[in-house]
Amino acid sequence: METWQEVTVHVHRDAQEAVSYVLIETGSQGVAIADSADYIGQKDRFGELYPDVEQSDMIAITAYYPSSTNLADVIATINEQLAELASFGLQVGQVTVDSQELAEEDWADNWKKYYEPARITHDLTIVPSWTAYDASAGEKVIKLDPGMAFGTGTHPTTKMSLFALEQILRGGETVIDVGTGSGVLSIASSLLGAKTIYAYDLDDVAVRVAQENIDLNQGTDNIHVAAGDLLKGVSQEADVIVANILADILVLLTDDAYRLVKKEGYLILSGIISEKLDMVLEAAFSAGFFLETHMVQGEWNALVFKKTDDISGVIGG
């Protein structure tokens, strides 16, 4: 029986995406995230047994490596990368790293125990595909099986993106989802009434996973998933473009986004750590957008821009 090596990194919640990326880059075959914020108030509602996660600002990110991996070298690299992240101003907290061996069948399913139904916005709830769930009146349920390499939709950057979509979509819109990942933003757009959604990702695995998740949700045949490099080569205009990716990538798509967003349409940008906020604002303003909403959770920022000639109540442009 093949065994796997499990490495758990305890860091501040704000460092979740950056640290997950580091773990994948060091050879991890997937990551699972235990965040106490995802379980607050859930026990009484679902009557389930939940992981023993103490309420705090720290989270546990568990990565899985093949048994052939030199774990000492991996841990040394992780510590170096975490120190570098801290030097850039990202809040990582008091970092600790643990490791253990794991059997094949445990590796395949271990991450699922950290993934439970979560009410993300007023209307939207994300539910793992293997969990039975009774939705309340008016509640819109997104079923996800993201696999270990994709987020479960509970990260602040995703939450803010979903909140923005909920506030903007009124029904009948065309939406473009750039860097779709698990497909959660596209599925939400469909449930919120968008007429047509185009979802793009450079990663073929993401394209496959997004399509699988779309197929888990009824009434989502209006979502079209394809491989794509940001908005390059895209000619379809949209009422809303949403992108929840790294700030350094967001600045590369603002000009194309302005070309494609219809007049009075919106651009939602998320995944922005505070130290790179000005860079993203400058890129969007230079493209011609006006800022309508700025959301903040911890070190993370989400921005809602509008393409408009009516600049009352908006900033920039």
UniProtKB/Swiss-Prot annotation:
Give the top-level enzyme category: transferase
Protein's cellular compartments: Cytoplasm
Query: Which key words tag this protein in UniProt?
Result: Cytoplasm, Methyltransferase, S-adenosyl-L-methionine, Transferase
Q: Does the keyword Transmembrane helix apply?
A: no
Q: Which SUPFAM superfamilies does the annotation name?
A: S-adenosyl-L-methionine-dependent methyltransferases
In the record, what terms sit under GO molecular function? Answer: protein-lysine N-methyltransferase activity
**Family affiliation:** Belongs to the methyltransferase superfamily. PrmA family.
Q: What protein does this entry describe?
A: Ribosomal protein L11 methyltransferase
Q: Which organism is it from?
A: Streptococcus pyogenes serotype M6 (strain ATCC BAA-946 / MGAS10394)
The coding gene here is prmA
